[in-house]
Amino acid sequence: MLVAVGLNQKGATVADREVLALPAEGFQSTLAEYAALDAVDEIAVMSTCYRVEIYAATRCPAAATLSLRQALNARAGRELPLFELHGEEAYRHLVRVASSLESAILGEPQILGQVKEAFQRSIDQGVAAKELTSVLNRALSAAKRVRTDTAIGRAGISWGHAAATLAEKVLGKMQGRRVVVVGAGEMARLSAQHLRDQGARIVVLNRTLVNGEALAREVGGVARPLEALGEELAQADVVVSAAPVAPDAFQPEAMAELSRSRKRPIVLVDLAVPRAIPAATGAIRDVYLCDVDDLDRVMKAAMSERAAAVADADRIIAEEVGKFVRAEAERRAAPLIQEMRTRASAIAREEVERTLRRLGEDPEVERRLEAMAGSIVSKILHAPSARLRQAVCDGCSGEALVSAAVEIFELSADIRVHRGNAA
């Protein structure tokens, strides 16, 4: 059975997470220690800035999660707010993580690779094998379906996302566009980061050049003094104004003259309140002005898209979890059902042979009797097999039925049913 134990940004502080974080130099030895814990058959550890989560395959969930909890608390030297999940809930959580539904930023693309890397490390080290490999492949397939079939990857809601969305409506893709960001504060930084991520070339203008240079380094752009605004307006495709500027910097008369000489569109994004750019400037030909109200409308639309994307993702994940549960039930019930069918088939074969001894050798009769016996075995065991698979899924409520089947059919198969979920 799959179990998960760990903590993440939703229920644990940075201080809690950092004591469990696995540095690269000690990763292999710590992974080996966890793999050697009581009742742990296979193991994978995901360690990022937002989460430290252990996924394990085990035949004894209660013992495995207890040993994992004890090991993690011992590593921290204190009791940690660890979560614990069993079976389908552990798998559901893994798919949500891989789909970025559990990320600090919904839709962020890095998490899928991080999940794959975490499991691959364990596979390479020999502490994860068939069961966790199967879980990983299923989870990655489900997460890719979420990203392909929903708008999760497009559901950003930052100021930068809104600014880029409005600019793209006018100019098309931001790849290679020259974007001038006025200011070096938080609004400027968020806008610069997102536009950089869209492929734009960033120029930061700031009254205090050293602050502008710091932001420029962060986004891979260049910094210039605020006095260069006039020169930059002649070259820019997009200007994001996130700091006070000279009163005449964006005056309609100056912008009209600039527009005539440029002969191409320019998008002005005014993030200031009160506004730094006069509304009349937006009426000039080839000048497209957006203010915070325009950005707010884009962000609300993105939030609505995100809510719809999450709902779509949850539906897909529910389907994928259902497939996982059915596959797990089939896998775990298979030894019991196989033994039951083998015993029934052996009895049927004995009766066929006894009948043939009375009737004498006749290949056609033998063929018909064997076909009839096989059909009877399949039909008699169809319902019991289906109920046993369901009993394995039902956990404790189905344990009595599994035990009864073992007793009634005199089976020796060792099968442990699901012992329930823990959140």
From Swiss-Prot:
<dbReference type="InterPro" id="IPR036291">
    <property type="entry name" value="NAD(P)-bd_dom_sf"/>
</dbReference>
<keyword id="KW-0627">Porphyrin biosynthesis</keyword>
<feature type="binding site">
    <location>
        <begin position="48"/>
        <end position="51"/>
    </location>
    <ligand>
        <name>substrate</name>
    </ligand>
</feature>
<dbReference type="GO" id="GO:0050661">
    <property type="term" value="F:NADP binding"/>
</dbReference>
<comment type="function">
    <text>Catalyzes the NADPH-dependent reduction of glutamyl-tRNA(Glu) to glutamate 1-semialdehyde (GSA).</text>
</comment>
<feature type="active site" description="Nucleophile">
    <location>
        <position position="49"/>
    </location>
</feature>
<feature type="binding site">
    <location>
        <begin position="108"/>
        <end position="110"/>
    </location>
    <ligand>
        <name>substrate</name>
    </ligand>
</feature>
<dbReference type="Pfam" id="PF00745">
    <property type="entry name" value="GlutR_dimer"/>
</dbReference>
<dbReference type="InterPro" id="IPR036453">
    <property type="entry name" value="GluRdtase_dimer_dom_sf"/>
</dbReference>
<dbReference type="InterPro" id="IPR015895">
    <property type="entry name" value="4pyrrol_synth_GluRdtase_N"/>
</dbReference>
<protein>
    <recommendedName>
        <fullName>Glutamyl-tRNA reductase 2</fullName>
        <ecNumber>1.2.1.70</ecNumber>
    </recommendedName>
</protein>
<dbReference type="InterPro" id="IPR000343">
    <property type="entry name" value="4pyrrol_synth_GluRdtase"/>
</dbReference>
<dbReference type="Pfam" id="PF05201">
    <property type="entry name" value="GlutR_N"/>
</dbReference>
<keyword id="KW-0560">Oxidoreductase</keyword>
<dbReference type="GO" id="GO:0019353">
    <property type="term" value="P:protoporphyrinogen IX biosynthetic process from glutamate"/>
</dbReference>
<dbReference type="Pfam" id="PF01488">
    <property type="entry name" value="Shikimate_DH"/>
</dbReference>
<comment type="similarity">
    <text>Belongs to the glutamyl-tRNA reductase family.</text>
</comment>
<keyword id="KW-0521">NADP</keyword>
<feature type="binding site">
    <location>
        <position position="114"/>
    </location>
    <ligand>
        <name>substrate</name>
    </ligand>
</feature>
<dbReference type="InterPro" id="IPR006151">
    <property type="entry name" value="Shikm_DH/Glu-tRNA_Rdtase"/>
</dbReference>
<feature type="binding site">
    <location>
        <begin position="183"/>
        <end position="188"/>
    </location>
    <ligand>
        <name>NADP(+)</name>
    </ligand>
</feature>
<dbReference type="InterPro" id="IPR018214">
    <property type="entry name" value="GluRdtase_CS"/>
</dbReference>
<comment type="subunit">
    <text>Homodimer.</text>
</comment>
<comment type="pathway">
    <text>Porphyrin-containing compound metabolism; protoporphyrin-IX biosynthesis; 5-aminolevulinate from L-glutamyl-tRNA(Glu): step 1/2.</text>
</comment>
<dbReference type="InterPro" id="IPR015896">
    <property type="entry name" value="4pyrrol_synth_GluRdtase_dimer"/>
</dbReference>
<feature type="site" description="Important for activity">
    <location>
        <position position="93"/>
    </location>
</feature>
<feature type="binding site">
    <location>
        <position position="103"/>
    </location>
    <ligand>
        <name>substrate</name>
    </ligand>
</feature>
<dbReference type="InterPro" id="IPR036343">
    <property type="entry name" value="GluRdtase_N_sf"/>
</dbReference>
<dbReference type="GO" id="GO:0008883">
    <property type="term" value="F:glutamyl-tRNA reductase activity"/>
</dbReference>
